[in-house]
Amino acid sequence: MARIASVQTEPIYYDVRDRALNPYSPDFDAAQVIEQVRRPNVEKQCERLRQAGENRADLVVLTEGSEVMGNWCQASDRPEARAQVVCEIPGETTEAYGAIARQYSMHVVAGLHERVGDTYYNAAVLIGRDGQIIGKYHKVHLTQAERAGITCGSDYPVFDTDIGRVGILICYDWIYPESLASLACNGPDLVCFPTHGYGWTEDLGEVTAKCRAADHSVNVAMAMTPSKFGPGRSCIVNRAGQIVADAGYHRDCIIYADLDLRLQRYDKFFVDESISDLGGRLFVDRRPETYKILTMEQPPALEKHMAQEHVRRRHEPEQRLARAHAGWAYDAENDRIME
């Protein structure tokens, strides 16, 4: 059995109009961003990791962007500012998380933003019991504002650990059924999901949590942020789609579930009276030759949706950057921070 923990904790916020923190201000000070935002948020996450370690967790999932550097990543027209505050991986933040993972001999999955040269990712790392990085994942599906300065990932890796095979998705990835379907093809036992929220309304979010797990017979551990993005409700779901740990709404807490991650789902299917590995049966019966339309760049439905101007313009570069500017209360036309 492995003890899985999901951390639900609210970030330490900042005022986007604080000129020392705002990358669009002439008074921007990277040192203040690090001292007022990044390091306090990392330390808060470290406190939660220590708490989970004291409770003998084998793997702990932290939220998306646990160091709260996402808005700076999106400021692509302020390259020097964002380069000064966003960490590389490995770096200061992963070293802090890794030290606690090593202290308690546990795995950590943490959402982070990553700088690779001039490229930025919404990432998540898997850290092993020895404090070393086992692997990392780059978010594939990015929101409009993220696309202003963050680069999409391109694959769905799975990593071997002593408790089972671990895969990762981040936030907006969850909205796309194809994401978990693709990840499931790589055979994870546990899917870790750092996020700011379900993306859907709360009731529909619960449904998708159950269905995504049951559809692919995988365990899922969600770590959400109870914040302005959503009310929280982190949860852990088993292969049968049953919620086995639930953080509830608007709470700062850690939830735990003891799971045998390698235990397959043996039950009846309504037209098949045999008792066998349901996940295995569903994979054996797949018809991938009929799914080709899913990988078409221009499926018939896209033409219909692109006829709507607001959809067509959604990812134009100026629209993306406008969303990033709005996040910083920046009036680009007049080059000023709005009060």
Residue ranges and their predicted role:
Residues 1-6, 11-16, 158-167, 190:
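Beta-strand-turn-beta hairpins that frame and shape the catalytic cleft
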Residues 3, 109, 123, 155, ...:
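Conserved beta-strand and immediately adjacent loop positions that scaffold enzyme active sites
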Residues 17-37:
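A solvent-exposed, charged loop/short amphipathic helix patch at secondary-structure junctions
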Residues 33-130, 181, 199-216:
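Cys-nucleophile CN-hydrolase/nitrilase-fold catalytic domain and related Cys-dependent amidase chemistry
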Residues 72-75, 125, 137-143, 235, ...:
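Short beta->alpha transition motifs characteristic of CBS
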Residues 86, 99, 115-189, 195-211, ...:
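Active-site catalytic loop in hydrolytic enzyme cores
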Residues 86-108, 165, 174-258:
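CN hydrolase (nitrilase-like) catalytic-core segments centered on the catalytic cysteine
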Residues 158, 225-339:
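C-terminal beta-strand edge segments of enzyme domains
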